[in-house]
């Protein structure tokens, strides 16, 4: 059953169901439950939390509860680019190994799309699309991939960059921001353009970005995660991966995924 309510609300729980024979029919038979497919094997379902906001593991099964992922933290050392031979490879034009005609997808905290390291030589964005899962504007016409958030496509991002160049507010066109900086760091290391003496591993690649929304409070409570610690739901990550795959198929280009999150589960 398609979702016709806001599945990002705190009183809506999410769970992951393996698509075994009869699973889809069983979900459709339940009232107040909607679902969307993560891939050919897994279904993400959504329903209203009980009044006590407690998860009944015995009836749901532990594996159906989305696990939480955090940011992989560490000092960024760009000297590693030389140590792995990336800069030497880029210096050999005959290899054509700069990532051209390849998509790199990011599932993280978003991206600073105004940064010059994500623009081509003409000043246009190299980002093909950004799915901002946190966006609640409700005006998205491009997001046919999931039932929440907003997808900003290349022409919109270029329009925002042009506005910024003209002294206007770019975020009135593309509201997405990377307030953490983690996603921007991951993208700049792996795909930064030649800028002020810096270059990433694949400066010719195009980018697809998913800004994950923060996990719901009931899952933080269940896994004893502090409120000030970034935490992201497994179900949102699965949908993000589907978005990247679907968009890459739409563009007809190979896809590499950078995933800078981790979990103790």
Q: Where do the language-model regions lie?
A:
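Subtilisin-like serine protease catalytic core
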Residues: 91-235, 252-256
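Autoinhibitory propeptides
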Residues: 1-103, 110-126
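Short C-terminal domain-edge/linker segments immediately following a structured domain
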Residues: 49, 73-78, 134-140, 239-243
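Short, well-ordered amphipathic alpha-helices
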Residues: 190-194, 240-245
């Amino acid at each position: 059953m398609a979702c016709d309510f806001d599945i990002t609300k705190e009183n809506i729980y999410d769970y992951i169901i393996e698509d075994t024979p009869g699973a889809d029919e069983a979900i459709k038979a339940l009232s107040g439950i909607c679902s969307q497919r993560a891939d050919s094997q897994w279904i993400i379902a959504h329903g209203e939390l009980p009044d006590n906001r407690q998860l009944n593991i015995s009836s749901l099964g532990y594996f159906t509860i989305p696990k939480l992922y955090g940011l992989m933290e560490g000092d960024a050392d760009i000297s590693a680019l030389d140590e792995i031979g990336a800069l030497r490879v880029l210096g050999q034009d005959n290899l054509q190994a700069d990532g051209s005609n390849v998509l790199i997808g990011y599932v993280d905290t978003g991206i600073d799309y105004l940064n010059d390291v994500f623009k081509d030589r003409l000043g246009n964005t190299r980002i093909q699309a950004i799915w901002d899962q946190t966006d609640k504007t409700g005006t998205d016409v491009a997001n046919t991939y999931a039932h929440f958030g907003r997808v900003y496509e290349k022409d919109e991002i270029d329009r925002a960059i042009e506005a910024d160049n003209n002294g206007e507010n770019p975020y009135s066109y593309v509201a997405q921001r990377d307030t953490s900086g983690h996603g921007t760091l991951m993208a700049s290391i792996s795909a930064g353009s030649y800028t002020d003496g810096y270059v990433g591993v694949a400066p010719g690649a195009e980018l697809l970005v998913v800004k994950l929304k923060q996990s719901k409070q009931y899952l933080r409570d269940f896994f004893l995660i502090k409120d000030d610690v970034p935490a992201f739901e497994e179900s949102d990550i699965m949908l993000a991966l589907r978005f990247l795959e679907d968009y890459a198929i739409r563009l007809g280009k190979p896809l590499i995924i950078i995933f800078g999150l981790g979990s103790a589960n």
